[in-house]
Amino acid sequence: MQKNYRVLLYYKYTAIENPEKFKDEHLAYCKSQDLLGRILVSSEGINGTLSGTFEQTENYMDYLKSLQGFEDIFFKIDEVDAHAFSKMHVRVKKELVNLSLEDDVNPLEITGKYLEPIEFYQKLQDPNTVVIDARNDYEFDLGHFRGAIKPEIKNFRDLPDWIRENKDQFKDKEILTYCTGGVRCEKFSGWLIKEGFNVAGQLHGGIHNYGTSKDTEGKLWDGKMYVFDERIAVDINKHEHVVVGRDYFTNEPCERYINCGNPECNKQILASEASEEKYLGSCSHACRIHPNNRYVKKHNLTTDFVLQHIASNLETQI
């Protein structure tokens, strides 16, 4: 069945002299094309993902490539049934990705060698290499390369400290690194080199490029890839599907993410529909009884019902 929409994932490190002006012009163009998505702009470049029809996305790619410094930008493209976003945002940030370094890394000056998907696939099977996932823990939990090391981090900016604390795991090895589309690895691999690690390379175009490449078709990837749009998760491995995600409550195989019903928590957890219903869409007892619980409000549950449900159905106060 033909899909009428596309999602574009892209980034480019290139100097932008006036990010605010660039943002305003960019937002105006995106709105003129009825595109939806999220784009970050900084003095160091652009990082975006957006959705639109075939014609709209073609026009956008032509537009961006027509701008000085963006002529060779690499777009990762997914065909989808509908828009993957509900709004259009273009925002200015200090950095495209935040490593919170005292001495920032400029990927235009130092970054790891780009490995095409087939090269990365071959390196994955080399016993002298270790593979570090440069994403957050909840992204890893949904899917990752077989044998990859999981940094226990909630935010990208925590990665350098985690590496320093765990350097014995890979100090004598060649390091491979990867992320969703490549933007985080540009800085992370450069930082690794500056720190003196032996970096074998970074996956060019990220997991997305690896999954769509005819040379690899996602081999040695387990689970799904987390994406920052309304799809939440997409398939990568075209040859087999190994579920690695586990239900937060039951530890059973699960690939369904929800946000905790407590808006002050908002923790992302993997939960089946049955678990979501049983635990009122919340990660803990405190979140279940929170006065602003979104799950409770959405289902018009009374306080008495919530307390009775907890007393009758939950043996432990998870």
UniProtKB/Swiss-Prot annotation:
Signal peptide limits: none
PROSITE patterns per the UniProt record, alphabetical: RHODANESE_3
Keyword Kinase: no
Catalysed reaction, written as an equation: uridine(34) in tRNA + AH2 + O2 = 5-hydroxyuridine(34) in tRNA + A + H2O
Keyword set, alphabetical order: Oxidoreductase, tRNA processing
EC numbers: 1.14.-.-
UniProt keyword annotation of ATP-binding present: no
A Pfam family this chain is assigned to: UPF0176_N
Domain Rhodanese: 125-219
Family as reported in the entry's similarity comment: Belongs to the TrhO family.
The protein's role, per its UniProt record: Catalyzes oxygen-dependent 5-hydroxyuridine (ho5U) modification at position 34 in tRNAs.
Protein name listed in UniProt: tRNA uridine(34) hydroxylase
Naturally occurring in which organism (per UniProt): Acholeplasma laidlawii (strain PG-8A)
Lineage: Bacteria, Bacillati, Mycoplasmatota, Mollicutes, Acholeplasmatales
